[in-house]
C-alpha cells in the first residue's frame, strides 16, 4: 500500500546557487558568483563588492515578496495557490522591503543589526529608509539524520543511528527506485533516510508590525500584508558606512555575495496572523533515499 505526501501549503525549490555553493564547500574550491546570480544585482545594492572566493559564506539571510501565488477561481471557492520557482532563478517575483522608516525615524543601531540592504527610497513624494534583507539567527540550527519508515500509509520518524552494519558494509542487491520520476506523489512503503536541518523562522510582533507598515505605505492599507515567497540566502557581512537624515555617519554591517539557496512559495497575510508567525522549513537533502522494505 502506498503512502501519499501531505501538502502543507508550501513549495520549496533548491537552487543552482545552492548546489554550486555546496560543491565549493565540499571540495574546498573557490566560491563562484556568476554575473546576475546575486540578490545584490536584483535589488541593485552593494553590487560593487564581491567576496573573495576563499571566503566561506553560509545561509543566514532572507528576503520576501508578495507575488509568489495565484488565485484559482475554477471552483465556487477561490483557492490561493503558491507558484513554484525555477531552480535557476536568482531574484524575486517582486521587490518588497521588510522595513520602511521615515528619515527621522530610522531603526536603532540595535534593531539595524538584524537587517541589511539599506537604501533610501522615495514613495509618494516622501523619503524613507528601506531594508530588504533580514538576518536569520542560525545559532540553534543543527543537522539531523532521520530514519523514516512508511508502513500501510503510516510514517514513523526517528533519528538515524549508524551501526556496525553501516561501518562494515557487505555487497548486496540495492532496491530499484527511480528518483527522477516525479510524476506522482505516491511514495511506496519502505525505509528511507535523509539528512538536513529544521530552520525555524520566527516573525515577532515587531517584524509583523514593520511589514504591515510597509504595506500601508505602499498600498494605502495594511489589510493585505501578504508574503507569498521567501528566499533563504547565503552571503557575507561587510562593514559599511551609513548616513542619517541629519548627515551624520555611522558604521553598520551590510551583505555582499547574497545568493538565493532556497525559495519557499507559500501564502500568509500578516494582517490576519496579527502579532506573530513561525515557519519551520526543512533544508538539506531534497528527497529521502529509499533503502528498501521496512523489514
State each model region's role.
Residues 1-295:
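Long, position-biased, composition-driven segments near the start of the mature protein
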Amino acid at each position: 500500500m502506498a503512502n501519499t505526501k501531505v501538502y502543507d501549503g508550501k513549495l520549496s525549490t533548491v537552487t543552482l546557487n545552492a548546489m554550486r555553493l555546496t560543491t565549493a564547500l565540499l571540495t574546498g574550491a573557490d566560491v563562484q558568483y556568476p554575473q546576475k546570480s546575486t540578490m545584490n544585482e536584483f535589488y541593485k545594492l552593494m553590487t560593487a563588492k564581491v567576496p573573495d572566493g576563499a571566503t566561506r559564506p553560509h545561509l543566514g539571510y532572507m528576503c520576501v515578496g508578495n507575488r509568489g501565488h495565484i488565485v484559482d477561481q475554477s471552483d465556487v471557492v477561490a483557492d490561493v495557490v503558491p507558484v513554484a520557482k525555477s531552480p535557476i532563478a536568482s531574484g524575486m517575483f517582486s521587490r518588497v522591503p521588510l522595513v520602511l522608516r521615515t528619515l527621522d525615524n530610522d531603526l536603532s543601531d540595535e534593531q539595524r543589526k538584524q537587517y541589511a540592504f539599506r537604501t533610501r527610497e522615495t514613495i509618494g513624494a516622501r523619503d524613507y529608509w528601506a531594508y530588504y534583507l533580514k538576518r536569520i539567527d542560525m545559532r540553534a540550527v543543527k543537522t539531523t539524520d532521520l530514519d523514516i519508515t512508511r508502513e500501510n500509509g503510516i510514517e514513523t520518524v526517528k533519528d538515524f543511528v549508524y551501526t556496525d552494519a553501516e561501518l562494515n558494509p557487505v555487497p548486496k542487491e540495492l532496491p530499484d527506485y527511480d528518483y527522477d520520476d516525479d510524476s506522482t506523489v505516491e511514495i511506496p512503503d519502505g525505509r528511507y533516510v535523509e539528512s538536513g536541518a529544521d530552520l525555524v523562522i520566527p516573525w515577532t510582533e515587531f517584524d509583523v508590525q514593520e511589514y504591515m507598515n510597509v504595506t500601508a505605505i505602499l498600498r494605502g492599507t495594511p489589510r493585505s500584508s501578504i508574503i507569498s515567497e521567501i528566499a533563504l540566502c547565503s552571503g557575507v557581512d561587510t562593514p559599511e558606512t551609513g548616513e542619517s537624515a541629519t548627515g551624520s555617519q555611522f558604521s553598520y554591517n551590510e551583505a555582499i555575495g547574497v545568493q538565493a539557496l532556497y525559495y519557499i512559495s507559500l501564502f500568509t497575510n500578516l494582517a490576519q496572523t496579527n502579532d506573530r508567525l513561525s515557519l519551520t522549513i526543512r533544508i538539506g537533502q531534497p528527497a529521502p533515499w529509499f533503502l528498501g522494505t521496512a523489514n
